């Protein structure tokens, strides 16, 4: 049994989802968004770090999973997203959590069955898979999707005993 924290990073809104995996069973523990009120990027990065640290303290996860940066036509946006990811990863590393990274297409495929799913499809499937009473906010659903992807990939990793799956794992120290 493990508690998985999934993060959908963003420089303005960072979504998170926390689930408990017990074998094949997934249980919803919490989700939400860290909304940045600071106007300047350094202040927003500090808010991401503090917010993720608070979530880690509250839920005590065993594992941290985060979406990888995808290539964007706007280089500035991709750089800001990378910095937001870095702030969240540092919070996980400071808590001695193993960090796993997943591509957006892999996350969508794990949740919906197709890597080309839109946000509404991800929201609907997350709601269905976790038996939620209502559709979660889009960024929170994406955070839950990252956690679900890790839970499914982790089962596959165990089954394949370390063969390549497209997931990256690391302990950043």
UniProtKB/Swiss-Prot annotation:
Cofactor(s) the protein requires to work: Mg(2+)
Entry-linked CDD domains: RuvC
Keyword match Hydrolase: yes
Reaction(s) catalysed (UniProt annotation): Endonucleolytic cleavage at a junction such as a reciprocal single-stranded crossover between two homologous DNA duplexes (Holliday junction)
Compartments in which it is found: Cytoplasm
UniProt cross-references to SUPFAM superfamilies, sorted A to Z: Ribonuclease H-like (SSF53098)
Residues that coordinate or bind Mg(2+) 1: 8, 139
Nuclease keyword on record: yes
MF term (GO), any: crossover junction DNA endonuclease activity
Catalytic residues identified in the record: 8, 67, 139
Family: Belongs to the RuvC family.
Quaternary assembly: Homodimer which binds Holliday junction (HJ) DNA. The HJ becomes 2-fold symmetrical on binding to RuvC with unstacked arms; it has a different conformation from HJ DNA in complex with RuvA. In the full resolvosome a probable DNA-RuvA(4)-RuvB(12)-RuvC(2) complex forms which resolves the HJ.
Primary role: The RuvA-RuvB-RuvC complex processes Holliday junction (HJ) DNA during genetic recombination and DNA repair. Endonuclease that resolves HJ intermediates. Cleaves cruciform DNA by making single-stranded nicks across the HJ at symmetrical positions within the homologous arms, yielding a 5'-phosphate and a 3'-hydroxyl group; requires a central core of homology in the junction. The consensus cleavage sequence is 5'-(A/T)TT(C/G)-3'. Cleavage occurs on the 3'-side of the TT dinucleotide at the point of strand exchange.
Protein name per UniProt: Crossover junction endodeoxyribonuclease RuvC
Organism the protein comes from: Aliivibrio salmonicida (strain LFI1238) (Vibrio salmonicida (strain LFI1238))
Gene field: ruvC
């Amino acid at each position: 049994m493990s508690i998985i924290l999934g993060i959908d990073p963003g420089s303005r809104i960072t979504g998170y989802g926390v689930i408990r995996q017990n074998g094949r069973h997934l249980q919803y523990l919490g989700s939400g968004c860290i909304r940045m009120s600071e106007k300047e990027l350094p202040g927003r990065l500090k808010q991401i770090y503090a917010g993720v640290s608070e979530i880690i303290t509250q839920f005590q996860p065993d594992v941290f999973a985060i979406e990888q940066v995808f290539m964007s036509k706007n280089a500035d946006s991709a750089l800001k997203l990378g910095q937001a990811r870095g702030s969240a990863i540092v919070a996980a590393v400071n808590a001695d959590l193993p960090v796993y990274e997943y591509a957006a297409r892999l996350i969508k495929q794990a949740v919906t069955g197709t890597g080309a799913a839109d946000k509404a499809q991800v929201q609907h499937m997350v709601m269905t898979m976790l038996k939620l009473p209502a559709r979660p906010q889009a960024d929170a659903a994406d955070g839950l999707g990252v956690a679900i992807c890790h839970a499914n990939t982790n089962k596959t990793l165990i089954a394949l005993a370390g063969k390549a799956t497209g997931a990256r794992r690391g302990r950043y120290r």
